[in-house]
Curated annotation (Swiss-Prot):
It comes from the Bacteria. It comes from Streptomyces griseus subsp. griseus (strain JCM 4626 / CBS 651.72 / NBRC 13350 / KCC S-0626 / ISP 5235). The keyword Cytoplasm applies. This is Elongation factor P. The gene is efp. SUPFAM superfamilies: Nucleic acid-binding proteins, Translation proteins SH3-like domain.
Length: 188
């Protein structure tokens, strides 16, 4: 339990029948007339839905402890992603729903942050940018500007992104894991 006066960004609250909500923004408001209150913007940890919620100042709210651990992606086992804890060497099977869009950028050996609450995996978080190899892309043709200077390329994970015309098959590039956009070449 914590008071609404103790709210901070990133704190996870248990509200609405046990649902987990992360504090995105908060503001303590002290109007000239009436009691003080706290205006918050909360994001549902599982669905990503964002809502505005107002609490009276000093009210007690349930907090949840989220255990984030760095784990290494080992391999796929059917529909499950198998991660290994680098400290204990324990393996953890994570379903595709919890991995989400991170599946587009995971290759064996990558380290990801796995968030758990009471033993249940909530989500998998990758670093903001990862380095991946272009598995296939067509050669860029001089003067071909119908696509705005980009062409499709397939990464080693099978995910397809748009890259500049000068990128060739086999090159290593940086990719933004949040948007899936090309960030640049990796200097060898």
């Amino acid at each position: 339990m914590a008071s609404t006066n103790d709210l901070k960004n990133g704190l996870v609250l248990k509200l609405d029948g046990g649902q987990l909500w992360s504090v995105v923004e908060f503001q303590h408001v002290k109007p000239g007339k009436g009691p003080a209150f706290v205006r918050t913007k909360l994001k549902n940890v599982l669905s990503g839905k964002v809502v505005d919620k107002t609490f009276n100042a000093g009210v007690k709210v349930d907090t949840a402890t989220i255990d984030r651990r760095d784990m290494q992606f080992s391999y796929m086992d059917g529909e499950y992603f198998v991660f290994m804890d680098m400290d204990t060497y324990d393996q953890l099977m994570v379903d595709r729903k919890a991995v989400g869009d991170a599946a587009n950028f995971l290759i064996e050996g990558f380290t990801a942050s796995v968030a758990q609450h009471e033993g249940e995996v909530l989500y998998v978080e990758l670093p903001a940018a990862v380095e991946l190899t272009i598995q296939h892309t067509d050669p860029g043709v001089q003067g071909d500007r119908s696509t705005g200077g980009t062409k499709p390329a397939t990464l080693e994970t099978g995910y397809e992104i748009g890259v500049p015309l000068f990128i060739t098959t086999g090159e290593k590039i940086k990719v933004d894991t949040r948007s899936g956009d090309y960030l640049g070449r990796v200097n060898s």
